[in-house]
């Protein structure tokens, strides 16, 4: 029960989901189709005014500049009307995006905490193993050496001289370092 996320009223609604830039552009184009239409009309009026200016037709050029102003006014009205019409939906979308960001931040934080807990557990396990090894080494140092049979000892030392006294890597490096000085 603790691992399950809290239920959200927006989970069941397919309208509220994360979207890519292209999906967002398409959605906005479908929501407010008059804005791109007004922009296209403005561009077309400017193009026609440019062509009229190149041709030297000042009357047509003035008409096209007026048409550009009307097209820009139409675009501005479409922006304002669309903003008023979709105001509540935009507020809901902003709230949803905030919730998504909070959820991602919480997941990131939880993953970080899990990683810290795992590292802490590994560190504790290592310390316990290290303490057990040290305790075993101290115990081995306190035990008396077993009695050796000379024949076996001579044969064993000839075959396996490293078993008699094993030194660690650090001790060997330290000995080499001291010999050089």
Curated annotation (Swiss-Prot):
Region (Disordered): 136-160
UniProt xrefs under InterPro entries: Hypoxia_induced_domain, RCF1
UniProt key word Membrane: yes
UniProt membrane topology term: Multi-pass membrane protein
Transmembrane stretches, start-end: 33-49, 69-86
Subcellular location: Mitochondrion membrane
Biological process, per Gene Ontology: mitochondrial respirasome assembly
Statement: the UniProt record of this protein carries the keyword NAD: no
Keywords: Coiled coil, Membrane, Mitochondrion, Transmembrane, Transmembrane helix
Domain HIG1: 6-97
Gene3D superfamilies: 6.10.140.1320
Annotated Gene Ontology cellular component terms: mitochondrial membrane
Pfam families assigned: HIG_1_N (PF04588)
Domain of life of the organism encoding this protein: Eukaryota
Main subcellular location: mitochondrion
Oligomer status and interactors: Associates with the respiratory chain complex III/complex IV supercomplex.
Summary of the function given for this chain in its UniProt record: Cytochrome c oxidase subunit which plays a role in assembly of respiratory supercomplexes.
Sequence similarity: Belongs to the RCF1 family.
Protein name: Respiratory supercomplex factor 1, mitochondrial
Gene name as annotated: rcf1
